[in-house]
């Protein structure tokens, strides 16, 4: 293949889908449970079937794909299992909104069966879109093993786990104060509640004593819940109220007398030191009410209104009830005052509704028995968490575990596998088989199944097991790939999901679900606020925001800030739009380069453009190389490379590649994805293209060396390209595969043989069907002499000096100039000359014993080496003028510093650190001045 056959530009729009079909059609994503390769299994965090993928999905799946491609190339039997999550609350809410908008109907307008048909239809449509988008990302999943959290196998697993825990006493049903979402009308687990700080009020209300004219004043943030009060609590050590403990007060409006109790948990400094106790609507009050055997009176309906226990306020919305209660209290002389107060309000993570503590009969998992095992897995490093900072978060959460509420008042989800006898609600059957229990089948009119479903996280908590075939203990996948090697997920669901997988999977299998966990940060994008003269602001979006994202200066009144991605803030970045604009490889490289190991990932929009340019650089660099290896054949690689024919620059690039491989091994082992991306990027751009290729161009074009050296360079260049494509493949699979297949096509059929230390691994790679199946590159088995490393380091420093001189004198980079070097030992410099000429833009270099006495040149110094560049007279005069200005500036600076440091008063009174800093500045200015004087002397 010649450069004429090689397109000038990389067409990712056509290439990416073609290559994905090629990989999938040839079964390159499939895992074999019967393989004797070491297993490496990963389960995909299943995206919800609620809509399309967002940038968080793009990140987590890119990181997984980078790892599985690397492990596949490293000789592992890789099993990456994709799947989707039924996402009970989220999906039901989305479908309800859809049906209300499209058909004007609510969920309750359908039968349960008909409503579920609508959700299944939604699931099928949404899942198809999600899986298609995962393919666009280049995910090399084993699609034949795709799972869904509500498929029959998952349902069997859920029922098996529920029954096992139930029969062992770890699942129970009871009344408890749950987190109630009044919009979705379901209970939520503690970690499904998000907390916000809001401005509110602290209300002071008077309660009259029974049989007395006295009264007690309490402070509360929720006066409407007084309808459910069953006690007033004070500290037993508070002398103000000591004599009142045991007395009773009247609850306004509901004709109820309640006791005043003493409880050590009451803070005497809060409010008046007396608090009302509403056990059915406050978690602290619930515990207090339980300890003091107080009645628990629920005053709320499932939708958050006031129920029949609310007296004259029954039937009102709670907000309206609060207004009416405050008015009525004031009319009766029971309202004292209100004062501003900061509230910590619980909010549903799904609906955004304010959470109500709500007394309800629910199913729970008792977690106290599992605490020890959950700690031991991580403390013993049987499960390793990366980054390590999250270990303490995990252990802290485990130490404060509360029983997990697993029942949800929804229709979409795994139905709780429990049947109740209609005449005795405590008589239950727990069943994990197909269909219904035999006892129910024999007498169906006497039994009914629990209408609730299980928390989504219950089925997700079994995901590593169900993906591999459990509860079938003889599943080949389970035997080969469990426990899984790694879980990659966001740190925000460490408690939602990761810990529950450890709990459920270990209790079912007796083994950990995974060996390592990598928790990535959450993606933040730049948002822009525009402020007006009154301090009011609004978010900027559209083309104006894009201009700022791409680097346009912000005008006055516009402020930028990194914030979580949010449509309302205008900083959402659609991964599919980025793929369409910049290509999948550019998106993957961008995400990897940002994936540091912190809690926040700042996604700079400009990186997409930068990595698109890099992809073009890879294409153009490969195209240049193809132009010089197009007539290369497999036998040339088989013949190998004569080490004696290698030059300094060859050892440099080989040494650089070896260092790259070692650095990448460390980066992959520690999940430093940002280093994986940037190390490969910098090697290709800086070391291979900008340095090595530039150095050897004269040889490639026949201007230096002989035919043998030209052949060596061409062969080594081909070997380097093959290996670098392998290194880049996990992060940029499409462009690397396209180029790899072109190399295979160029070289044709490969003869038998192993090659040598330089070409052997490249030959093994080329014998693979594709780059993604090729063995991952290894360090070249060649020793790089230390003196050669030092010589190239010297060459780099000299090149820097040359470029600095050219830059200072503003010399045209295309202008090839003559130079000279003065040094005591010319041996080392001799080997550097081709490098200095190629990278410094020099026509020739003379080795001299001393500087020319006169001449139009400018020079620099590296250690004891003086390097001069002969320049045209007009440039030299310009440079002389610049140096004269620098001389005047530095002489004044030295004079001022000498005067200051010669002042005894200053040296005695000034801060010692300041004196030292001035002394250091004087020293540096003197050195710089002497250098300027030396250069000026050469112009004399």
From Swiss-Prot:
A motif ('KMSKS' region) lies at residues 564-568. The lineage of its organism: Bacteria, Pseudomonadati, Chlamydiota, Chlamydiia, Chlamydiales. It holds the Pfam family tRNA-synt_1. It comes from Chlamydia pneumoniae (Chlamydophila pneumoniae). Residues 873-905 form a coiled coil. Catalyzes the attachment of valine to tRNA(Val). As ValRS can inadvertently accommodate and process structurally similar amino acids such as threonine, to avoid such errors, it has a 'posttransfer' editing activity that hydrolyzes mischarged Thr-tRNA(Val) in a tRNA-dependent manner. This is Valine--tRNA ligase. CDD domains: Anticodon_Ia_Val, ValRS_core. It catalyses: tRNA(Val) + L-valine + ATP = L-valyl-tRNA(Val) + AMP + diphosphate. A motif ('HIGH' region) lies at residues 47-57. Its EC number is 6.1.1.9. ATP binds at residue 567. Disulfide bonds: none annotated. It is found in: Cytoplasm. One of its GO terms (biological process) is valyl-tRNA aminoacylation.
């Amino acid at each position: 293949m010649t450069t004429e056959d090689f397109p000038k530009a990389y067409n990712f729009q056509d290439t990416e889908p073609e290559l994905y079909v090629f990989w999938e059609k040839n079964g390159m994503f499939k895992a074999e449970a019967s393989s004797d390769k070491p297993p490496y299994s990963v389960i995909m965090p299943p995206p919800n079937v609620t809509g399309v993928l967002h940038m968080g999905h793009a990140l987590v799946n890119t990181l997984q794909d980078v790892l599985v491609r690397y492990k596949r190339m490293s000789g592992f039997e890789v099993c990456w299992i994709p799947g989707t999550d039924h996402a009970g609350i989220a999906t039901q809410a989305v479908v309800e909104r859809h049906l209300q908008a499209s058909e004007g109907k609510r969920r309750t307008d359908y039968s349960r069966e008909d409503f579920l048909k609508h959700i299944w239809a939604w699931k099928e449509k949404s899942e198809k879109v999600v899986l298609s988008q995962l393919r666009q990302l280049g995910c090399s999943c084993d699609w034949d093993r795709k799972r869904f959290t509500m498929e029959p196998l998952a349902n069997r697993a859920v029922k098996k786990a529920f029954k096992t825990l139930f029969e062992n006493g770890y699942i129970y049903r009871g009344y408890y104060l749950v987190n109630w979402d009044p919009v979705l009308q379901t209970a939520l687990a503690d970690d499904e509640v998000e907390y916000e700080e809001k401005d509110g009020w602290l209300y002071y209300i008077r309660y009259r004593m029974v049989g007395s004219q006295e009264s007690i004043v309490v402070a509360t943030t929720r006066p409407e819940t007084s309808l459910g009060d069953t006690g007033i609590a004070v500290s037993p050590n508070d002398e103000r109220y000591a004599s009142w403990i045991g007395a009773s007060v009247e609850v306004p409006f509901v004709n109820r007398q309640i006791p005043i109790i003493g409880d050590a948990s009451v803070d005497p400094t809060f409010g008046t030191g007396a608090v009302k106790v509403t056990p059915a609507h406050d978690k602290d009050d619930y515990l207090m009410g339980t300890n003091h055997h107080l009645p628990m009176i629920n005053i709320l309906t499932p939708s958050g209104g006031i129920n029949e226990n609310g007296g004259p306020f029954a039937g009102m919305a709670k907000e309206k009830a609060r207004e009416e209660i405050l008015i009525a209290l004031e009319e009766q002389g029971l309202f004292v005052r209100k004062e501003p107060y900061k509230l910590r309000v619980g909010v549903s993570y799904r609906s955004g509704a304010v959470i109500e503590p709500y007394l309800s009969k629910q199913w729970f998992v008792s977690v106290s028995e599992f605490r020890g095992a959950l700690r031991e897995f991580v403390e013993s490093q049987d499960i390793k968490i990366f980054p390590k900072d999250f270990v303490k978060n995990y252990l802290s959460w485990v130490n404060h575990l509360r029983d997990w509420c697993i029942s949800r008042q929804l229709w979409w989800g795994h139905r709780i596998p429990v049947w109740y006898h209609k005449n005795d609600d405590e008589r239950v059957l727990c069943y994990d088989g197909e269909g219904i229990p035999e006892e129910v089948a024999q007498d169906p009119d006497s039994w009914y199944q629990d209408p609730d479903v299980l928390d989504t996280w219950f089925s997700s908590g079994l995901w590593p097991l169900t993906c591999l075939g459990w509860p079938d203990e003889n599943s080949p996948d389970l035997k080969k790939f469990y426990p899984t090697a790694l879980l990659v997920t966001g740190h925000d669901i460490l408690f939602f999901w990761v810990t529950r997988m450890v709990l459920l999977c270990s209790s079912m299998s007796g083994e950990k679900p995974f060996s390592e966990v990598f928790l990535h940060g959450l993606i933040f994008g730049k948002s822009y606020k525009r402020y007006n003269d009154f301090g009011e602001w609004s978010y900027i979006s559209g083309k104006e925001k894009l201009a700022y994202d791409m680097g346009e200066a912000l005008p006055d009144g516009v402020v930028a800030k990194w914030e979580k991605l949010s449509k309302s803030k205008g900083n959402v970045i659609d991964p599919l739009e980025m793929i369409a604009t910049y290509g999948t490889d550019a998106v993957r490289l961008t995400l990897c380069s940002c994936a540091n190991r912190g809690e926040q990932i700042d996604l700079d929009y400009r990186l997409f453009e930068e990595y698109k340019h890099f992809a073009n650089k890879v294409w153009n660099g490969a195209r240049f190389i193809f132009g010089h290896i197009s007539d290369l054949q497999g036998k040339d690689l088989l013949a190998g490379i004569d080490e004696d024919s290698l030059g300094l620059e060859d050892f440099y690039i080989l040494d650089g590649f070896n260092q790259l491989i070692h650095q990448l091994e460390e980066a992959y082992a520690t999940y430093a994805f940002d280093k994986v991306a940037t190390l490969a990027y910098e090697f290709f751009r800086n070391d291979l293209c900008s340095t090595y290729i530039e150095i050897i161009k004269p040889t490639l074009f026949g201007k230096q060396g002989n035919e043998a050296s030209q052949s060596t360079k061409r062969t080594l260049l081909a070997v380097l390209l093959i290996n670098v494509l392998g290194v880049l493949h996990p992060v940029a699979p499409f462009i690397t595969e396209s180029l790899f297949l072109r190399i295979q096509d160029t070289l044709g059929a490969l003869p038998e043989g192993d090659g040598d230390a330089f070409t052997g691994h490249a030959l093994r790679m080329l014998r693979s069907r594709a780059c993604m199946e090729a063995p991952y590159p290894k360090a070249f088995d060649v020793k790089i002499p230390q003196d050669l490393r030092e010589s190239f380091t010297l060459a780099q420093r000299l090149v820097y000096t040359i470029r600095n001189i050219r830059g200072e004198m503003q010399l045209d980079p295309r202008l090839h100039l003559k130079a000279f070097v003065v040094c005591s030992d010319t041996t080392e410099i001799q080997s550097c000359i081709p490098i200095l000429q190629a990278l410094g833009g020099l026509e020739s270099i003379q080795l001299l014993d001393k500087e020319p006495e006169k001449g139009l040149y400018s020079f620099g110094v590296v250690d004891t080496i003086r390097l001069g560049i002969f320049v045209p007279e007009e440039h030299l005069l310009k440079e002389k003028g610049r140096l004269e200005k620098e001389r005047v500036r530095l002489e004044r600076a030295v004079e001022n510093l000498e005067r200051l440091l010669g002042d005894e008063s200053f040296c005695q009174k000034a801060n010692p650190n300041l004196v030292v800093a001035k002394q250091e500045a004087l020293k540096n200015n003197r050195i710089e001045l002497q250098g300027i004087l030396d250069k000026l002397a050469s112009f004399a």
